Design a protein with these regions (language model features):
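Short hydrophobic/aromatic helix or loop-helix immediately within or flanking a transmembrane segment
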Residues: 25-51, 143
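Signature aromatic-anchored transmembrane alpha helix within multi-pass, membrane-resident enzymes
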Residues: 130, 182-187, 307-334
Length: 335
């Protein structure tokens, strides 16, 4: 938020054109230097409307983030029906990392477009409307303008397409057509952005990579560091989403793999392992990866719904809320 005055001073066009250059990049906060310009632009737009103050900015961020409830419910409903959709929202609303970090970081607003693009993707799988594929590309474009973590969604779609080729050849052809249109839409967005503002996304990515490596290292300096960092990434995220939810998600995913090879959770499992061991992230993933919420809560909700055991559901919800409260206390006191 401290970078908003800089954008206000130089103007949007100059800010985008010179984002990766020294006169802008070196003036940014360390956090902004590891992100694309969308986050600062997002806050700048709302500061123009409501003024430059932390209270209105926090409220806008929370309200904007809360809209993810809609695509999460619609995604769960599209895949598994209304009952799973409702249960997914209940589990989502008590997910520790999302509750804690939505009001304390920009990763909440960053999660909106990746989650929306995921819903649109699965909606397009059962539809012939090309406009859905175009919207997927636009959502990914906006998501990538706010956080580089949106690359995870692109990788997930790729893994889904590969598994579709293996297990559902008919669906594969439709997925490829959808992703091709989405890719064209994505490229067109950044092509037009470059044409009108001279913003070079490749320069911005490279500058952010070098900034991150300077502070955190590459992650593969030694085999020991690589393995410990990658394993810690995975564990930090799975603990952050809530141990009870993680167990339910894991049981649900394994059940789907042993059964009909449901591609929604199985594609996520493969993608999660790849990203966790990619060294693209050096911890804090319990915050950065909160956009992965639907991939956890929806399979967990489906598993609990199929068990049809109220005692199990109450146990998962109670223990997750307990973990949330403990995390809140530790975050605001000990940590």
């Amino acid at each position: 938020y401290g970078d908003v005055p800089l954008l206000n001073k130089v103007g949007l066009y100059y800010f985008l054109r010179n984002y990766a250059k020294a006169d802008i990049f070196l003036e940014l906060s360390g956090h902004s230097q590891t992100h694309p310009p969308g986050g600062v632009i997002f806050l700048w737009v709302f500061s123009k409307i409501f003024g430059y103050n932390l209270i209105s900015t926090s409220l806008i961020s929370i309200l904007f983030t809360s809209t993810v409830i809609i695509p999460i419910y619609l995604l769960a409903k599209t895949l598994y029906g209304k009952e799973v959709g409702r249960l997914s929202i209940i589990l989502f609303l008590i997910m520790p990392n999302f509750v804690i970090f939505t009001s304390t970081s920009m990763d909440g607003p960053f999660s909106v477009f990746p989650i929306l693009s995921t819903y649109l993707f699965f909606k397009s799988v059962s539809s012939t409307k090309k406009v859905l594929a175009i919207c997927i590309g636009l959502c990914l474009s906006l998501g990538m303008l706010m956080t580089y973590s949106t690359v995870f969604i692109g990788l997930y779609f790729t893994i889904f397409a590969v598994l579709s080729f293996v297990f559902d050849r008919q669906q594969f052809h439709h997925v490829i057509k959808t992703l091709s249109i989405s890719l064209i839409s994505f490229v067109a967005f950044y092509g037009l952005l470059f044409l009108f503002t001279d913003f070079n996304p490749f320069e911005a990515v490279w500058a952010s990579i070098k900034k991150d490596e300077a502070g955190m290292g590459t992650g593969y300096e030694t085999i020991g560091r690589y393995l410990s960092l990658s394993t810690a990434n995975l564990l930090a995220f799975l603990i952050g989403v809530g141990a009870p939810l993680t167990i339910s998600w894991l049981y649900g995913t394994l059940k789907s793999i042993r059964g009909t090879w449901d591609l929604f959770p199985s594609s996520y499992l493969v993608t999660l392992v790849i990203i966790a061991f990619s060294t693209l992230y050096t911890m804090e993933v319990e915050r950065i990866w909160i956009f992965m919420a639907p991939f956890i809560v929806i399979p967990a909700a489906k598993y609990l719904h199929e068990r049809n055991n109220l005692a199990d559901l109450r146990c998962v919800i109670s223990l997750t809320v307990l973990q949330l409260l403990l995390f809140e206390v530790m975050l605001y006191t000990y940590w």
